[in-house]
UniProtKB/Swiss-Prot annotation:
GO molecular function: fumarate transmembrane transporter activity; malate:proton symporter activity; succinate transmembrane transporter activity
UniProt-listed GO biological process terms: L-aspartate transmembrane transport
Subcellular location: Cell inner membrane
Functional summary from the UniProt entry: Responsible for the transport of dicarboxylates such as succinate, fumarate, and malate from the periplasm across the membrane.
Pfam families, sorted: SDF
Gene Ontology cellular-component terms listed: plasma membrane
Protein name: C4-dicarboxylate transport protein 1
InterPro entries in the cross-refs: C4_dicarb_transport, Na-dicarboxylate_symporter, Na-dicarboxylate_symporter_CS, Na:dicarbo_symporter_sf
Domain of life, per lineage: Bacteria
Protein keywords: Cell inner membrane, Cell membrane, Membrane, Symport, Transmembrane, Transmembrane helix, Transport
The family this protein is said to belong to: Belongs to the dicarboxylate/amino acid:cation symporter (DAACS) (TC 2.A.23) family.
Residue ranges crossing the lipid bilayer per the database entry: 20-42, 57-77, 90-112, 160-179, 192-214, 229-251, 324-346, 361-383
Naturally occurring in which organism (per UniProt): Bradyrhizobium diazoefficiens (strain JCM 10833 / BCRC 13528 / IAM 13628 / NBRC 14792 / USDA 110)
Amino acid sequence: MTTMATAAPVRASQAWYKILYVQVLIAILIGAMVGCLWPSVATNDWVKALGDGFIKLIKMVIAPIIFCTVTSGIAHIQDAKKVGCVGVKALFYFEIVSSFALLLGLAMGNLVRIGHGLAVKPDAAAVANYVKQAEASKTVDFILNIIPDSVVGAFARGDVLQVLLFAILFGFSLMALGKRGERLRGMIDDVAHAVFGVIAIVMKAAPIGAFGAMAFTVGKFGPAALGNLIGLIALFYVTAALFVVVVLGLIARLVGFSIFKFLIYIKDELLIVLGTSSSESALPQLMEKLERLGCSKPVVGLVVPTGYSFNLDGTNIYMTLATLFIAQALGVDLSFGQQLTILLVAMLTSKGASGVTGAGFITLAATLSVVNPALVPGMAIVFSIDKFMSEVRALTNIIGNGIAAVFVSWWESELDHVTLQTRLNKSTASTTIDTTST
């Protein structure tokens, strides 16, 4: 199975002020300061436009990203024929674990209610059209609207579910073509690389967008808004840690190894992901390490790349948690039925998320636009802190895909338990020695 990920190039260390993470951090601090000291300046339409403009740039690439990632992911599943029912087992595992991630994010969001009391009131004119569309929508219309009148129209409007439906059908069609579809699959992968290049260009404007979003948020809603945003970051970190330790930890224990030893074993890959905010940056290295860990090569070759479209646990947690935060901040009370809709929609939109930097925010935009378009303007609230959550999203994603490969190998009775324990114990011992020597 092929993948759109490539090994991260080795780069010489660059000046600290050229690192995107540092630039965004500085922009956020300056934005918060401007919002506190000069609220009249911070609430200027031009300052607000900086954040809104960046969000529009992100929304611009939603449709092509979903089409390319979903189509490519499904089309390449033809390799599952070589490994029996591995593909079916992997997809079953992905859906079950993804559901746990979504439910955990939803549960923590309802339990802590970190956005409650923020009382953000977005521009009424900007929201009016969304509200009108939401009120006019009926269930049967919602279902029928998933089917596009034309594919071109779906892409032109950026209708997420319509593009997703076409991507799924197109992916299965390519899979059925077999070798005849190889050239077209390659073209789609090339287009995906080009779209990721667009994202890379757009992300260079992230500091400007972060400044505008933070300055406007603090200037309009006061310094108290900072407390809620920091609270959201902390809540997401805690929720992701709970998922890794409890959910993935139980899966690891079922197979017969410690989740903590596994984390030590892939520590180098985790550091790469931490530095790039993209779980795809360490994909080739992760696959190699999983094979050396005793996992079946065909299973690793299928499960890990497929997981980058179908098993993004960190992104799933983020989507439900951020959606609830935005709804609470805007004073929108979501019923049980609406929260159930969030789960169902997120199960679909998350399949269009890639491990590329910023994809989690793109997926959030896709989810909000389907669940309740009136919440879309609220994305500006969380955009300014998205960079601080992207690292944890990426880390959780890569850990989840690593555990998935080990579990499916075990499920298929193609896991070398002796090699598994030997490698994990050796890695833990070497880390302990290194720590002691320093």
